């Protein structure tokens, strides 16, 4: 049984906004105790909090994209990241897997001119895990982001948001 009245946060969250302000302070104090540089603010709903990590480093992220033909999809994927991402320290590793269309190889020639793009050739039968492992061995980044070639960036901060969580010493994968 839960009692609700006009001054209770269960009935009206705005009745005690200080409770949510104290929630922010508690989360911030936790980060301070464990040595994670961060700021905390109210989230979109009462009782939810948003963390902004304040890392000094901006490590290289290797974006691995397996591809077989579908040059238009790959271009759309890469262009969306190049145009929208607020995080700029990344490289693309395209893992080519038995394409046959000339336009695909023409696109590879075009993108290989960029400093942050490499095309690797995986000549075995399709196996998503093996293809990604093959690409990861060649990655220069400290962090690896696995994407499909038909993925498009929607939120400009998505790479930074994932990286921020992944950089925590108690996190291994996001």
Where are these regions (language model features)?
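Conserved donor NDP-sugar-binding/catalytic core segment of glycosyltransferases
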Residues: 151-174
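Cell-envelope/extracellular polymer assembly enzymes that use nucleotide-activated donors
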Residues: 59-64, 91
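Glycine-rich, basic loop-to-helix element that forms the pyrophosphate-binding segment
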Residues: 122-139
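Short aromatic/hydrophobic "clamp" motif used to bind/position activated sugar donors
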Residues: 144
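A conserved acidic beta->alpha catalytic loop
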Residues: 96-107, 124
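Catalytic core of nucleotide-sugar-dependent glycosyltransferases
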Residues: 13-38
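Active-site beta-to-alpha loop of glycosyltransferases that engages the nucleotide-sugar donor
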Residues: 65-76, 87, 98-99
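Short, acidic, metal-binding catalytic loop of nucleotide-sugar glycosyltransferases
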Residues: 79-89
